[in-house]
């Protein structure tokens, strides 16, 4: 009677143990650990070394992937989960390989992917060098011609009409007004003077003339002078 009254009065709860099916998992069964020990001892005690095959790299990557999958599968044990909760979590765990393994397989499958930029060598580039510049030494580029505007040409023509030779002061003023350099003004006037002499058929002053020829033209030939004296 005392025992029955004690059981009735106390808040005793019957312990609930997990079903026997959960204990039959491979991680808890002694046969699983025994098989692992036998495999490890067989691998260490192998009298003959492994033969190196052509697929050694692929087998190594496959074993590394398998090892990473096993480590990810054993993570719930380290977190201290109840075996019953582990049984619910394991079916939902993904079986895909880690990203490192997938990257290795993609590299072996597609070594030349179209996403990589093509390599451009110097001899593949276009060389924008004209034929005239090829004669210059050290790759010196030819000076480009100055493109004068219509307003600039008109002002220069006016100045040339009044004065064919410019002073330094006037050249600076025109260059400042037309937004040109002094060298450009100087070259334009030189070219314009050459054109003007050619149009008027004037001799080029840069060519040295023979003084004896000039004297004969100015005074006439000596035979003509003798004839004139005889006639007188």
Swiss-Prot record:
Record has DNA-binding as a keyword: yes
Superkingdom as given in the UniProt entry: Eukaryota
Residue spans binding DNA: 141-200
Keyword Amino-acid biosynthesis attributed: no
Entry GO terms, CC: nucleoplasm
Coiled coil regions in record: none
GO terms classed as biological process: anterior/posterior pattern specification; embryonic skeletal system morphogenesis; positive regulation of transcription by RNA polymerase II
Keyword tags: Developmental protein, DNA-binding, Homeobox, Nucleus, Transcription, Transcription regulation
CDD domains given in the database record: homeodomain
Subcellular localization: Nucleus
Pfam families per record: Homeodomain
GO molecular function terms listed in the Swiss-Prot or TrEMBL record: DNA-binding transcription factor activity, RNA polymerase II-specific; RNA polymerase II cis-regulatory region sequence-specific DNA binding
Region Disordered, residue ranges: 28-117, 210-232
Motif residue range(s): Antp-type hexapeptide: 120-125
Biased composition (Low complexity): 51-68, 94-104
Family: Belongs to the Antp homeobox family. Deformed subfamily.
Role: Sequence-specific transcription factor which is part of a developmental regulatory system that provides cells with specific positional identities on the anterior-posterior axis.
Name used for this protein in its record: Homeobox protein Hox-B4
Organism encoding this protein: Xenopus laevis (African clawed frog)
């Amino acid at each position: 009677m005392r025992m029955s009254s004690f059981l009735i009065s106390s808040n005793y709860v019957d312990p609930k143990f997990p079903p026997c099916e959960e204990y039959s998992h491979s991680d808890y069964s002694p046969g699983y650990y025994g098989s692992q020990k036998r495999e490890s001892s067989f691998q260490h005690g192998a009298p003959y070394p492994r033969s190196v095959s052509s697929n050694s790299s692929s087998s190594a990557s496959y074993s590394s992937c398998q090892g990473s999958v096993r480590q990810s599968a054993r993570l719930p044990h380290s977190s201290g989960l109840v075996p019953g909760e582990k049984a619910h979590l394991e079916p939902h765990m993904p079986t895909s390989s880690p990203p490192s393994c997938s990257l290795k397989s993609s590299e072996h499958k597609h070594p030349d992917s179209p996403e990589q930029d093509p390599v451009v060598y110097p001899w593949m580039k276009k060389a924008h060098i004209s034929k005239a510049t090829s004669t210059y030494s050290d790759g010196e580029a030819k000076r480009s011609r100055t493109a004068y505007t219509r307003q600039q040409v008109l002002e220069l023509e006016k100045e040339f009409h009044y004065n064919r030779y410019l002073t330094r002061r006037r050249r600076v003023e025109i260059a400042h007004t037309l937004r040109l350099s002094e060298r450009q003004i100087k070259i334009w006037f030189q070219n314009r003077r050459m054109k003007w002499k050619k149009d008027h058929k004037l001799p080029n002053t840069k060519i040295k003339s023979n003084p004896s020829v000039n004297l004969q033209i100015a005074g006439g030939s000596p035979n003509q002078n003798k004839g004139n004296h005889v006639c007188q």
